[in-house]
Amino acid sequence: MKADIRWLDNPEIFRVNREDAHSDHAYYASYNDMEKKSDRWVMLLDGLWKFRYSKNAASRPADFYKEGYDDSNFDMIRVPGHIELQGYDKIQYINTMYPWEGHEYRRPAYSIENAGNGAGMFSEASYNPVGSYVCTFDLPETFQGNRVYVCFEGVEQAMYIWLNGEFIGYAEDSFTPSEFDLTPYIRTEGNKLCVEVHKRSTAAFLEDQDFFRFFGIFRSVKLKAKPCVHVEDIFIRPILWNSNIQGNLEVNAKLSMVYAKDIRVTAVLRDKGKICWSQDMKMQYSDKGTSNILQVTGALKDTLPISITPWDHHKPYLYDFCLEVRDQDNCLIEIVPYAIGFRRLEIIDKVIYLNGKRLILTGINRHEWEPHKGRCITEKEMRIDLMLFQQNHINAVRTCHYPNQIPWYYMCDEAGIYTVSYTHLTLPTNSLV
């Protein structure tokens, strides 16, 4: 498959070869790796990348991804970071209008009788800036022999990806991770990852938030190695009964497997380091069809034989959950940790109750923001915000107007902050979408 610049204009195409969305869990080869937060299977690609700015698609270096292309005259840019805050393009703030209103007439494809199919709307625009990024890397020894993926945690707004001259995929949706399989084209040394980012696409009709408009790779980029058996997706549902001391635990998991083998998957719950419950999951195998990767699914629901400590903002009590994957010899292949809390949220006669008691929310709206770096923030800024929350007796937050970085949600669990998480979906008043 080859990349097509016309995908920018087509509202029906918003992902090509992108992996399905899945849970945001970490995973490790052993408990020792987990305790040390080992990077055995994760490598950050953040840092200085080669970069070329172009005003539109027609003037971009269209062949920059090809092997042997001379990019010696490219600039250097920091990833993650907004392109506009590193000396290129212009900063723009818009609230209730599309960013091109008053400059260009655009209506979404098929939205009104004379809208047409949108051909050339963005791909042939005189102003639709493009950022061409190049990163070179060698494969870590711990990655070799495993499946290798790249994860972009946030890219505004549409991106094309190549590795070693081969087209990998395309994605829109600026504030959710996009993950791609690099395995067929990865090398031990001298890999060339190329990313072409376009400021606007048909996604712009849906991503019309009231904030500063930027573009570029503004969140971290990670290489991930997946072992022969890997937990792809996990859903954990802690259920607190009316007694507030008893409850159930529901677990659903989906695993991928390079080749068929017997495995044992065990759910384990710990309280302050001590195992208080564990149970094996019954797994079902299914062939994916066109792929060589087998899919394995499992589910369980059990009443916990413990006296539960509920979670609330006064006492955000968390239990340590782990999903263990072992082979037929009982050797650990992978573990997936998750911190979970038990709470019961209800609305009775238009009143919110938590664990049977009325809940009073003292909340705020929060943008991811740092004065010099825009929405490109780190965990340091997140912790400062949480400190301000606690100093001002704030117990709830609305992530206006987009999904925040993944660590933020874990921090809110730990700090006892009720979180309303937005999807990145906002249309202006009287929109024709």
Descriptions of predicted regions:
Residues L163, G247-Q284:
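Beta-strand-rich binding/interaction modules
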Residues L85-L139, F143-C151, Q157-W162, C228, ...:
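Active-site-adjacent substrate/metal-binding segments within catalytic domains
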Residues C194-E196, D320-E324:
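Extracellular recognition modules
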Residues K2-H22, Y31-K36, K50-S54, H82-Q86, ...:
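Accessory beta-strand-rich segments of carbohydrate-active enzymes
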Residues G145-N146, I186-G190, D302-L318:
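Short glycine/proline/serine/threonine-rich loop/turn segments at secondary-structure transition edges
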Residues G165, V221, Y319, G356, ...:
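Conserved, mostly hydrophobic/aromatic
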Residues C228-V258:
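Surface beta-strand/loop "capping" patches
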Residues T423-T429:
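Conserved small/polar residues in nucleotide/adenosyl-binding loops
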